[in-house]
């Protein structure tokens, strides 16, 4: 079974999960840390309330964490790996894990747990090599962290050249 883990339902990913459910014989489930975006909510970047024009949960197997997570994840530390997700990842039936990002603590915990349990592990993240930190301390920490984290990934699902370069640099 393939487990896909995301922070919350994202409008441009949902059609992929719906097609996967319709077209394939691959057993999968999407696990969400929060329900952010399911109901209309105010978006600071856009300066208005956003309501998506598609149903974000219908047509594919998904569920939310059974433990309390903040409605909106605001920083790396705000979402740790829920126990129910940990059990699902450890399960014998789970063979592959697709992680959609590495921006929260829970995702790093999933990577470590996946490696310990010898699960086949994929990463798709909207990161790139274009941003340069001005602080040498931050740069060195980031290099060490990414080298460690990326060494646990079996396959990187790249999004463009800058994203691919980021992974290749480690």
Regions found by a protein language model. Name each.
Residues 1-64, 89-93:
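N-terminal subdomain of nucleotide-sugar transferases
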Residues 31-33, 124, 159:
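Generic beta-sheet signal
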Residues 120-122, 128-152:
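Nucleotide-sugar donor phosphate/pyrophosphate-binding loop at the beta->alpha transition
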Residues 153-160:
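A short beta-strand/loop micro-motif in the catalytic core of glycosyltransferases
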Residues 164-170:
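Helix-loop-beta element that forms the nucleotide-linked donor phosphate-binding surface
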Residues 55-83, 100, 137:
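A short, charged, and often flexible helix/loop element on the N-terminal side
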Residues 11-14, 78-80, 96-117, 123-125:
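An aromatic- and histidine-rich active-site surface loop
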Residues 24, 92, 116-119, 152:
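Helix C-cap/helix->beta junction micro-motif
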